[in-house]
């Protein structure tokens, strides 16, 4: 299983969290899409934006994104195999930690019980509960 940048952009149509976000939005400067591959079979996908502040909604995410932000914001993740979502988040965070000047790993998550259980069971802490989202933080020492 290996981490790659996503090149098959048709896969973003499968995004259950933010299907309305375009490829242009997801690949703008300061944003990246990664996938977890096993034998050329995509197991999970994550979209990341870099900021210097914690965004509370998509509008702030768009405004705050910059190429060299110190915060990696995971704003959508989905998987095609059991356990792949967890591995996707942790492997991506590890890759970013080792290759970019990022100090914090934050999510911009929907206010759902599924998102809450997913992030808390993977070691994240609830950072803040917003009107339209919840931010979870993955402690650096976990990564």
Predicted regions and their residues:
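Conserved catalytic-core motifs of GNAT/GCN5-like acyltransferases
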Residues: 125-137
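Acyl-donor binding region in acyl/amide transferases
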Residues: 58-123
């Amino acid at each position: 299983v290996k981490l790659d940048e996503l090149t098959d952009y048709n896969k973003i149509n499968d995004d259950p969290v933010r299907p309305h976000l375009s490829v242009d939005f997801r690949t703008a400067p300061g944003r990246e899409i990664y996938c977890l591959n096993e034998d050329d079979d995509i197991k999970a996908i994550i979209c990341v934006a870099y900021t210097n502040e914690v965004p509370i909604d998509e509008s702030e995410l768009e405004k705050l994104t910059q190429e060299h932000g110190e915060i990696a914001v995971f704003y959508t993740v989905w998987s095609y195999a059991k356990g792949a979502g967890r591995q996707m988040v942790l492997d991506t965070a590890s890759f970013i930690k080792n290759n970019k000047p990022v100090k914090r790993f934050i999510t911009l998550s929907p206010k759902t019980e599924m998102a809450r259980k997913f992030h808390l069971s993977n070691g994240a802490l609830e950072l803040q509960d917003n009107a339209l989202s919840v931010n979870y933080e993955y402690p650096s020492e976990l990564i």
